[in-house]
Amino acid sequence: MHLTLLPQFTLINYSPNQPFTYSQQITIFTAMLKAQSIHKSYGQLHILKGVDLEVAKGEIVTIVGASGAGKSSLLNILGTLDRPDSGQLYIDNQELSKLSNKNLSNFRNVKIGFIFQFHHLLSEFDALENVCIPAFIAGLSRNDSEKKATRLLQMLGLGDRMKHKPNELSGGEQQRVAVARALVNNPALIFADEPSGNLDSTNARELHELFLQLRAEFNQTFVIVTHNEDLAALSDRKVTMKDGLIIQ
């Protein structure tokens, strides 16, 4: 018996003396993110107690659990905003623990997008300029950055709001600008921490549907911390945290 891995990541079982049939194909998924035995303490408080999590490319995973379960601490480590005390983290087939702070920052800016409950848009810049910031940091020219940002804002229904500053936008519009900013470098992975927590039910529903649209159009991978049961129900998989561990 031989095993052959095709470029499409399909595992084929075959015997040289038997004709191949499609029923022998077993599709396997490439891991976009893999966390192994993640531990984190702050002083004497042990927050994460050996968390294991694997997320496939193109998957939408929500993390739920009571306040204090360790959800946001885990998201910060998965998103490389903080380092674990021990454990291994792989994103897009790269192990990150040995990267210097500078290289980790560069990796984060190119490979990862963030969406938070509060949009954190810079008030002195308009929507287009806010979306361009990560592209500028990545070294993209102003012309190319503005082209990418314009396409994203138009796709998100903000083509006529690009020159408006954050205080001239509604809450839902501000969050869509934040989504465009998260996407401008075409990241491999997007992390969201309570992304609809500051929105009314209508804007929250539109944001949740937007995540599905982005996954369909760009094969984006999402890891989302949320208390919103509607958003959790839309995801491909819901994982629950309790006392610093994933319990299901």
What would you call each of these model-derived segments?
Residues 11-14, 21-39, 247-248:
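ABC-family P-loop ATPase nucleotide-binding domain
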Residues 33-241:
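ABC family nucleotide-binding domain
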